[in-house]
Amino acid sequence: MSDFDPAEPKSGNPDRRDFLGGLAAALGAAAVAGGAAETAEAKPAKGSSSRPVSDAKLRAAIDTVVVIFAENRSFNNLFADFPGLQQPLSEVPAERTRQRDRDGKVMEKLPKIWEGLVPSKQVVEHTEYLIGPDDLAPIPNGPFALKTPEGDPLPHGLVTRDLVHAFYHNQMQINGGANDQFVAWGDSGALVMGHYGDMRAQLRMWQIAREFTLCDNFFMGAFGGSFLNHQYLIAAQPPFYPDADKSPAAKRIAKLEGDDPKGTRLKLDPKTPASAIDGPAVFGPNTLSPDFWAVNTMLPPYAPTYELDAAKPGYANADSAHTLVPQQHKTIGDMLSAKGVDWAWYAGGWNAALEGRMNDASFPSRPNFQPHHQPFNYYDRFAPGTADRAKFLRDGGEGSTARTNKFLADAEAGKLPAVSYYKPQGNLNMHAGYSDIDAGDRHIAAVIDALRASPQWEKMLIVITFDENGGWWDHVAPPKGDRWGPGTRIPAVIVSPHAKKGTVDHTIYDTGSIARFLTRRFGLEKLEGLKMREDAMLAAGGVAPGDLTGALDIA
């Protein structure tokens, strides 16, 4: 199973001048994320942008940076009442958590969980589970701890149903910062409001966070899903599809309310029920914006991918509506290479996918490789046969031991490059619908153990974070930014001998803060998208996102 849907989310490159012009226009658009909402009092995140640390001391302290990029969890979903939070969920007034229907009225109760909480039969700890839409009692309007029909905490080893997580949906759910229409514009009914209530004792990541630094104001860089947030991680901008209206992808261009191509609201299909109580909203295509930015999932132009060119080995089918044209704009990889800084993207299951083994017949499927989670594979600089592809795009192997996992083997041998991105294979990434919390949590804990035992540990900084919220609700209003984000709050843990110990860092960060840290530590040219985001947030009266140094204790 994959989170790529060749249809649309079922709720229901330009040259430098064009890039700067498009992003500059985005700054002028009204951002929906952090503005005061008419329907509820939004309580935005507050925090300083960074802690003063001299560049010289930073260079002396950190030689190796590792980014572990997991999948699809909001901050509340995993860390709702972690000790020391600025805005713990249990202290949020009920009126700030109530969801509003499509007509803007407060809902009397939440809908059923459409398709069921656990729609596929599974066995966890010798107990069989199959939890359908009618198996849970009516759920009051507000956040709730995920439980079985018997009232026990939902086992972390269960794969729940997936939730829609997409660019326009996320903005409509955030609703100007009120975060009160996650149910209305989601596709899973009540499930968006669920969280795991027993993490203190069960989640290994909690223990890692308690030892090091948890960031409680870290927001996903872009509204929406995995594809766009992986691109934001490395480029701080969406990909662009020139002349998309004349391309095979023409029918995937979004239809919005009004005539503004920079609009934020999808046009509703007439078949949409008036109330979310009666079923999910129905929308038309929305992969590309009307001005041709790729904002929802498209597939890479190169293998590994789902639709290959039979006549051109290593390449995708360019005539497919799902294939994105190769991109040319700058990424953090370009900036690192320009400075002579070694780096790599380790993709779990990469070689398996190239060999045709993306999945197996089990559930959850293994390794369940996700082509759209490999952001550098969209750029012509890394096309098949190039030296850069061979050097920088690496197979991460499979599993959680150095015998089978090549990233762990390099860590154990002290051979990681100065900057390493690690993307776990699909069944170990925590993505609802095809992965479970426990498998991903155990895997990340094993990775952290290996990194702490590495010869490179003493001068290492590790960022554990998630690409996006996966459709799950969070109560903290994202700061007002630019056209692309920031979106919903997500977890981030900073692990390092130089991280503050037992600390919750309240600094405002977004996914781009990782690139900001790399830019500062290695003296890189700054990506244009990072500058745009900083300018937009300052212009909105907020602070620019920090560069992660607020989580460090460097004397």
Model-derived features: positions:
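N-terminal pro-sequences and low-complexity stem/linker regions of secreted or lumenal proteins
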Residues: 2-555
